[in-house]
Design a protein with these regions (language model features):
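Residues immediately within or flanking Cys/His clusters that coordinate Zn2+
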Residues: 4, 59
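Short recognition patches in nucleic-acid-associated and regulatory proteins
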Residues: 6-53, 73-91
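Short Cys/His-rich metal-coordination motifs, predominantly Zn2+-binding knuckles/fingers
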Residues: 8-10, 62-67
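Short, intrinsically disordered terminal segments enriched in charged and Pro/Gly residues
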Residues: 48-52, 75-132
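Acidic, metal/cofactor-coordinating or nucleic-acid-engaging core segments within structured domains
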Residues: 55-57
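Amphipathic alpha-helical interaction segments
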Residues: 68-72
């Protein structure tokens, strides 16, 4: 079951082959990183020269249009779009904190969470809830 992952800004394909390709920035340095497209698989391929340590905050952007992928709803998360077999489509929301295993697949019907740091508390990507 192959999903296509796309940039929410330019609709460019982010997984032309096996991995999702994103630009990552941290402490004035940038690199292309490869993420697993499999939900719950948190393995990341990072160049040796681009050192990341647990709890580092990483800024992700589209490698095609360079737009920031930080979520407008939660600055500690990034988001991209996905489309799967049939009409299944939605948003993937994932942590920008290196080593923080938290990913959500959000569709019109449901939210699926993956990772030991993910949980239902406070997760609401439909916009309903308390007013700020």
């Amino acid at each position: 079951m192959k999903r296509d992952y796309t940039c929410p800004w330019c609709d460019g394909i982010l997984n032309p082959n096996v991995k999702i390709i994103l630009k990552a920035e941290r402490a004035g340095r940038a690199a292309l990183v490869l993420l697993s497209p499999q939900p719950g698989n948190f393995q990341v391929i990072v160049p040796e020269s681009f050192k990341l340590h647990r709890k580092d905050e990483v800024r992700f952007s589209c490698p095609l249009c360079a737009r920031d992928l930080t979520s407008k709803r939660d600055a500690t998360k990034a988001q991209i779009h996905f489309a799967g077999p049939g009409a299944q489509s939605g948003v993937v929301v994932f942590s920008r904190i290196f080593g923080h295993h938290e990913t959500y697949f959000v569709t019109n019907q449901e939210v699926r969470s993956y990772g030991e740091n993910a949980g239902p508390a406070g997760v609401n990507y439909w916009g309903a809830g308390p007013k700020e």
